């Protein structure tokens, strides 16, 4: 399963670890992904999404129905 937020599209980014001596080694910064079940009243079922806390705030603001419509418009299966 890929480490991508289904709502915001946030993915891992790359950067450097920096030691005290300023040595740089490559590393990945992973998004804070959470698996969360949402009740969809229109479909009378739960939908599990893998998303970041920002994605959860977007769902709080817009509603799960609107966010699911946007995800399905992108072609993702939910």
From Swiss-Prot:
GO cellular component: cytosolic large ribosomal subunit
Residue span of region Disordered: 1-25
Keyword list, A-Z: Ribonucleoprotein, Ribosomal protein
Top-level division of the source organism's lineage: Bacteria
GO biological process: translation
GO molecular function, one term: structural constituent of ribosome
Record HAMAP family: Ribosomal_bL28
Family statement drawn from the similarity comment of this UniProt entry: Belongs to the bacterial ribosomal protein bL28 family.
Protein's name according to its UniProt entry: Large ribosomal subunit protein bL28
Origin species: Tolumonas auensis (strain DSM 9187 / NBRC 110442 / TA 4)
Lineage: Bacteria, Pseudomonadati, Pseudomonadota, Gammaproteobacteria, Aeromonadales
Gene assigned in the entry: rpmB
């Amino acid at each position: 399963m890929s480490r991508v937020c289904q709502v915001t599209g946030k993915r891992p980014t790359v950067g450097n670890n920096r030691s005290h001596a300023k040595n740089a080694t490559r590393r990945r910064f992973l998004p804070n992904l959470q698996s969360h079940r949402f009740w969809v009243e229109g479909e009378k079922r739960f939908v599990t999404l893998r998303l970041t806390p920002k994605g959860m705030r977007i769902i709080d603001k817009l509603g799960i129905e609107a966010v699911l419509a946007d995800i399905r418009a992108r072609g993702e299966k939910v």
